[in-house]
Amino acid sequence: MGKGVGRDKYEPAAVSEHGDKKSKKAKKERDMDELKKEVSMDDHKLSLDELHRKYGTDLSRGLTPARAAEILARDGPNALTPPPTTPEWVKFCRQLFGGFSMLLWIGAILCFLAYGIRSATEEEPPNDDLYLGVVLSAVVIITGCFSYYQEAKSSKIMESFKNMVPQQALVIRNGEKMSINAEDVVVGDLVEVKGGDRIPADLRIISANGCKVDNSSLTGESEPQTRSPDFTNENPLETRNIAFFSTNCVEGTARGIVVYTGDRTVMGRIATLASGLEGGQTPIAEEIEHFIHLITGVAVFLGVSFFILSLILEYTWLEAVIFLIGIIVANVPEGLLATVTVCLTLTAKRMARKNCLVKNLEAVETLGSTSTICSDKTGTLTQNRMTVAHMWFDNQIHEADTTENQSGVSFDKTSATWFALSRIAGLCNRAVFQANQENLPILKRAVAGDASESALLKCIEVCCGSVMEMREKYTKIVEIPFNSTNKYQLSIHKNPNASEPKHLLVMKGAPERILDRCSSILLHGKEQPLDEELKDAFQNAYLELGGLGERVLGFCHLLLPDEQFPEGFQFDTDEVNFPVDNLCFVGLISMIDPPRAAVPDAVGKCRSAGIKVIMVTGDHPITAKAIAKGVGIISEGNETVEDIAARLNIPVNQVNPRDAKACVVHGSDLKDMTSEELDDILRYHTEIVFARTSPQQKLIIVEGCQRQGAIVAVTGDGVNDSPALKKADIGVAMGIVGSDVSKQAADMILLDDNFASIVTGVEEGRLIFDNLKKSIAYTLTSNIPEITPFLIFIIANIPLPLGTVTILCIDLGTDMVPAISLAYEQAESDIMKRQPRNPKTDKLVNERLISMAYGQIGMIQALGGFFTYFVILAENGFLPFHLLGIRETWDDRWINDVEDSYGQQWTYEQRKIVEFTCHTAFFVSIVVVQWADLVICKTRRNSVFQQGMKNKILIFGLFEETALAAFLSYCPGMGAALRMYPLKPTWWFCAFPYSLLIFVYDEVRKLIIRRRPGGWVEKETYY
């Protein structure tokens, strides 16, 4: 992809006058597909001559300033284009008008409409509808502000990319070195980088001196990678002669030619990929939408039916419209929006205490419905520190302790060979502990040096005491540092042991190279000739440790004879004047980044919870497979195709892939797969490891899982993970080692970088889903005793049993705390033993929940309310049958002589006081029956006696709603303010039998469900 091609690919599409949206969308999809493809470039394959011709750059003098200015004008600055951001006011409006809020807004508008109609037609219209409209609007605005505030901290993806862009770059133009702003670097520029610099653009290295770069933010490989002019791999991400934009140079120096700048760099493409991805709706948002459809359906159905009915009953058009509006509004659960928001916030707070920081409230529940987790290996499943795992000396393998707290196995440290091996590992080692860490445990100390050497340093320090003291005793005279051509490191030390010669040569390096330099081997402290049998033993040990996915190093030494090398001898490392062959082989030490202690248990929990854990790593397949087996992602006894082939001794291509439950897929194979082949792998293998994968592939794997209908969680820490984090249903970033970019793209951040915290998150997510169901069931039930009075008022023409203001007191007063208290309810059974919920069938609110809340419990509650209503009116002289058809005269303010059943006459004022007392009593009855409803909503299957009453907030809720009801009824002045009147104590007890009935009815129902699982009762009533 030359300069021209690279540029054209990102030209904005010409859009016709009509603003052709379709072509824009198609272009976006095309661009995304482009980005998903692997990085394609051929600059790493070109010779220096071809590079010179392609870019017109003088390889020693660089570009001329004039040419550089031309290219800058053509390509634009070397910077990442920020994505279009959503303005804050749009985000705020989404909170105000999204989903549930819309339902309440419609309710509010209908209230104002009803008030308007009444004002136009009546002389002194009641203000109920006006109050209701104002309250509904206030509820939406307050909850909207609350949600907006919760989420305002999110989505600044590009901000963090900006911080990663280097500020200055050292370029050579016209043979002169100049430091320029990194944004002015152009394709073809000759750039110099040194240790500590950020790479300013994608470079093709033309000369290097000991240059190493840290690519971890891009590829996920934790080891620094060597950079040299040599073309070593077809894949541009793997070859040594390309350095990538915004990675760090950790040591050495290098010169290179800029091949891509800005958005066209590999990092730029990832940035574009991450910001261009659509996150999609969260499962809970879909659930709430589904719920709104249900509720609206019920409300409109009831409203229209009674509208028609009231016309049949010869009401006027205007009255019928007001009834219609009243019924629809009465159906809206005003308090539910606040309840859901508060429940999610509480869970988010609870998760933060357990090291999961949730950025987006709805993500709390998404984690609970997760059915596949794609996890990174390094640092998430593992401890992210190389640790000595095994040693081979005295012709046997010894296991070292890799646990985080040194509680594991130990080996025999008495052998003389171990003394020699630990001496080499400590001396032939440039790693040192950083200062002032004496009080810290050895394994927690920071080390200056590369990963393998730090592992050796810590191991020897733990097993043999201070390495510094050892190094002081054995003074270093000269050393040859490790380099990639001879693949060993060597040093010569003064030997303080009187029984041995005065100089000790120690060497470590690649095992096969070390063995080639040895003629003898140390066994039990005695030197013996190295024969074929021992060479075979070495080979077997080397293969076994390598097969465990460990990095193996060989160690040897030589005591230099005093005759040839007396004290004060001048050793020369350039013209080597000492032996580097015929040494004595001592042993092997292998290292691995070991699994975290809590991970195997967490993976086991995921498995019993029906969640598939897939490992996706940039690491080597053998290492990946070893760790996967170590943590249980590949469980014991499950074989891969390669294992089966090895067992049956046949070629791999003769094994039927479906016989293997587990599989390890190499990134290079994944590259050539069609999406159907990937789907087959994901469908037919239960245990999967993807190794050597690139960022684009991680995205393809996530999409593959989503095609299977899975809800996918992805963990990641590098920049390379951000596209996958954004695409997944829930992206989980690492809080400690994660790059800013990955944290921005994620929905949740693990503060302790531990995979086990995800499992805690899943548990919390499942619990909140269950508890939201209970909250909603509780809240919806009181809708029926709120609507039925209105319906009976229309049909039977009786005085209104329950007013609008009292309905508001229930929905936004007495019901709020109890509904929220259900969020604190403990899990009924082990929620981690069941399969993830199926988003298509297992809904938050289903028909069964509506039938239970409205059709069964709600009806009993309504009966309780009407019973109280009729009792009070009868005590005042109006018997039930006398009330039928009395509405017209009852509500007429000019009639002051309405007779009751006993012939007494009632004025308008007196009648209204009795009516409002009934409203208050009906309200209190609803509170009383809601006690029972709250208690039965604690569980969906268990008996309340099994669950117990441990939820303190719920008990507080019961007292709170009762106290509030009493306050509203007995507080002086309530008659004028809310038209609530004091009740006789006996009237409180009218609804008690109904409350008891609800409790008994539901306990019996749950008993039948437990006794006959899958039976008719469960099918019809278990929500």
Swiss-Prot record:
Impact after mutating P83R: Dopamine fails to increase phosphoinositide-3 kinase activity and to promote its interaction with Na(+)/K(+) ATPase
Annotated Basic and acidic residues bias: 1-11, 28-38
Phosphoserine PTM positions: S16, S23, S40, S47, S228, S452, S484, S668, S675, S943
Residues found modified as N6-acetyllysine: K9, K21
Positions contributing to ATP binding: K487
Region (Disordered) location: 1-38, 216-235
Cellular component aspect of the GO annotation: apical plasma membrane; axon; basolateral plasma membrane; caveola; endoplasmic reticulum; endosome; Golgi apparatus; intercalated disc
UniProt KW Transmembrane keyword: yes
Record annotation: effect of changing M859R: Results in altered sodium and potassium transport
Region listing for Mediates interaction with SCN7A, in residue ranges: 596-717
Binding, Mg(2+): D717, D721
Intervals, Extracellular compartment: 109-131, 309-320, 793-802, 867-918, 971-985
Positions annotated as active site in the UniProt record: D376
Propeptide: 1-5
Entry's family note: Belongs to the cation transport ATPase (P-type) (TC 3.A.3) family. Type IIC subfamily.
Name of the protein in question: Sodium/potassium-transporting ATPase subunit alpha-1
Designated gene of the protein: Atp1a1
